[in-house]
């Protein structure tokens, strides 16, 4: 039987539909989640697709995201079969080396048994992990703060880069909001949305304001903006498991952990 992995930067509409159906089927069968963008970026400078075909039928796939030209974050969507998974991991490692990647992370739900068994056998532990949290608006009863969150201007970009410890991507900058007092940039976050699903990313408060309640007010103000746009919105965010202060903030503001992603 002919097996082949074909690497692509763009997908046809039929391929997009096939990949979405395969992902949804495996999520139901395995009871796990995949860390993937909601859309398939067209001509994306940072997305790679590896399509695993058997007799011309796509049976599994790999999606890799590279935002800095050096680090690849990849997700494998495949049946829960050991040899199948190992073959895809080997293909990913080989291809990443050809692209000149300095670092590769395989991102997996911590309940994905085949992947866990694969890394456990090799004595490999996650480099780090993230909790994926979802806002429970039905049970949230607190009054939301209403700080003014603004789009950054050219004059804000240097301060924003210092706060983020790096220059944001142009496409991220379009969705970035900042909070300022006395012309000082004190906090930032980014709101991404697809249809009625909203993600809060890149949430950073300047060190001098941490632990003083500003982060809570900025988060509440972002929630207010989203819910005023769509009262039925699904809102999510992610936080590293070691960041207990942020995790506590999110959980006291109506977010509950849905699952955990491990980065190997």
Annotate each predicted stretch with a short phrase.
Residues 1-35, 130, 140-168:
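Short amphipathic alpha-helix that is part of the acyltransferase structural core
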Residues 26-54, 161-190:
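Active-site rim helix/loop that mediates acceptor-substrate recognition in acyltransferases
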Residues 34-87, 189-198:
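Conserved donor-binding loop and adjoining core beta-sheet/short helix segment
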Residues 82-94, 205, 211-224, 247-252:
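Conserved acetyl-CoA-binding loop-helix of GNAT-fold acetyltransferases
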Residues 106-114, 236-247, 263-264:
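Conserved beta-strand-loop-alpha-helix junction that forms the acyl-donor binding cleft
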Residues 115-120, 124, 250, 255:
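Conserved active-site tyrosine of GNAT-family acetyltransferases
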Residues 125-138, 238, 256-264:
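Conserved catalytic-core motifs of GNAT/GCN5-like acyltransferases
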């Amino acid at each position: 039987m002919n097996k082949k992995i074909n690497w692509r930067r763009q997908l046809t509409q039929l391929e997009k539909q096939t990949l979405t159906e395969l992902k949804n089927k495996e999520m139901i069968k395995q009871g796990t989640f995949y860390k993937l963008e909601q859309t398939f970026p067209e001509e994306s400078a940072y997305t790679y697709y590896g399509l695993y075909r058997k007799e011309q039928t796509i049976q599994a796939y790999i999606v890799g995201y590279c935002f800095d030209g050096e680090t690849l974050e990849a997700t494998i969507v495949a049946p829960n079969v050991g040899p199948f998974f190992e073959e895809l991991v080997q293909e990913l490692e080989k291809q990443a080396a050809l692209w000149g990647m300095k670092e590769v992370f395989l991102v997996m739900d911590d309940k994905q048994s085949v992947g866990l068994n694969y890394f456990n056998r090799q004595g490999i532990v996650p480099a780090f992990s993230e909790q994926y949290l979802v806002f429970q608006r039905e049970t949230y009863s607190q009054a939301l703060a209403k700080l003014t969150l603004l789009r950054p201007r050219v004059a804000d970009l240097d301060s924003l880069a210092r706060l983020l410890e790096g220059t944001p991507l142009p496409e991220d900058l379009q969705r970035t909001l900042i909070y300022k007092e006395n012309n000082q940039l004190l906090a930032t976050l980014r709101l991404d949305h697809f249809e009625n699903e909203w993600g809060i990313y890149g949430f950073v408060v300047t060190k001098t304001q941490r632990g003083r309640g500003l982060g809570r007010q900025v988060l509440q103000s972002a929630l207010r903006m989203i819910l005023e746009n769509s009262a039925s919105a699904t809102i999510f965010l992610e936080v590293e498991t070691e960041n207990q202060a942020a995790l506590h903030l999110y959980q006291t503001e109506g977010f509950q952990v849905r699952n955990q992603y491990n980065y190997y």
